[in-house]
Amino acid sequence: MACTTILVGKAASYDGSTMIARNDDSGSGHFTAKKFTVIHPEELPKTYRSVLSHVEIPLPEGALRFTAMPNAVEGKGIWAASGVNAANVGMTATETITSNPRVLGADPLVEYQPAKGEKPEVPGGIGEEDIVYLVLPYIHSAREGVLRLGSLLEQYGTYEMNGIAFQDVNEIWWLETIGGHHWIARRVPDDVYVVMPNQLGIDTFDLEDAFGAQENYLCSADLREFIAKNHLDLSLDGALNPRDAFGSHDDADHVYNTPRAWYMLRYLNPRTWVWEGADADYTPMSDDLPWCMVPERKVTPEDIKYMLSSHYQGTPYDPYLSYGDKSAKGAYRSIGINRNDFMALLQMRPDQPEESRAVEWVAYASNAFNTMVPFYANVERTPEYLANTTGAVSTDNFYWTSRLIAAMADASYNKSLFHLERYEEAVLSAGRALVNQYDAKLAAEPDAARRAALREEANTAIAAMLQEKAADTLDKVLFELSSQMKNAYSRSDA
């Protein structure tokens, strides 16, 4: 999937949380309805079979309950996408990334080959359809997630290039696949944030640590030999740069990928570097934009939502630009694009008890026109308003309501923008107020069963607030667009 990811280490976040967030985007010309749900251990099969690649994988015992964002319409696989398990481990998968012919020629992708004549079918590897479902229920730390997924990649291979994030309350790890069976992973330093458009991102890698103490780096077992045999290290000084070795520097990156990283880095570090003009240190087309940076101030969930909603506001590249030189308008792929399916921001709060530590912030449809809302992740079920998405358009659920608001607001942008700004702030404020209220109730409740009920009660209250404000905003945006219809006439009937 075409996506955008932000990772924030605990010392870089406003409250000591680890935070991982990703826009899940459909490919061009497609939209994928999503639902926010809980998958229970008893729902998991003993053997998993991929719909797309037909690979079959036995699943271990001891699965954990986890939240997920699967496709609302069945038929093309689960695509669990993002969630938190009962051990407070978060995972988001995947960020589609890039590679190069040197890598793909040395370790080809493991693609499904259908039966032909007397030849039986040959299953493919694992991919975005499968990864969260195969990994998240079976891990108890972010590092365990890297190791389990790495083992699956080495054994079964993959048919696509992907980046995957794992978190617990202490650590964030980012894994990138290399060819069909290889991978690297790096622990995100506590004091930085990471921005990831759709290209291989890790820009430094310590092989000595990966094959030694493994404190900050992990990789596939034969990576050293793989690099040497295929002459993949392009460095002059012996310091491996994975982007050069395994990634891409294509013209398409300069309109589709690097501008997104540039905008996010520029937002959180506006004074660290020069971002524009003839003397710029970095431009939207720079290939050497840092994978991670120490921010100039601590990062909030609202910052993450703003960046993941970006359409290059405040730059000449904004597709909604209405004044000045418009020659570069819409030149680059927006982060908040029309085909955002959902955004999930997973937050592990260290100042809260384990059972209420994980908060999952959710947004549906185009981020440029929506709002996000927090929910407790340690629950047995999710509110119907976010879980009952169907293939048919309906204002009874948050996904389709958000899609309708976005489509109408886009067509009435100047008139509807202030409604959207008020909507987003109102939902964020009310959502935070309800979480604060229920955090206090949970802290005062000695009974574990009652606390579990309170978490679901909180989510129900948050969803009710959200539904009311979303319906009100839909009404206002519909009015603005209706007022702009071409058959409008300024004179009323006598």
Locations of the language-model features?
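Histidine-centered catalytic/metal-binding microenvironments
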Residues: 426-494
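Glycine-rich, aromatic-lined ligand/substrate-binding cores of catalytic
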Residues: 225-351
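Short, conserved catalytic/metal-binding motifs centered on acidic residues
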Residues: 6, 145, 344
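Short Pro/Gly-enriched beta-strand edge/turn motifs at strand-loop
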Residues: 61-65, 146, 322-330
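Second-shell loop/turn segments in exported
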Residues: 118-121, 131-139
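Secondary-structure boundary elements
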Residues: 138-147, 151-160, 314, 350-353
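Substrate-recognition/cap regions that form aromatic- and gly/pro-loop-enriched pockets
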Residues: 312-313, 317-444
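A contiguous strand-loop segment
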Residues: 2-128, 148-280
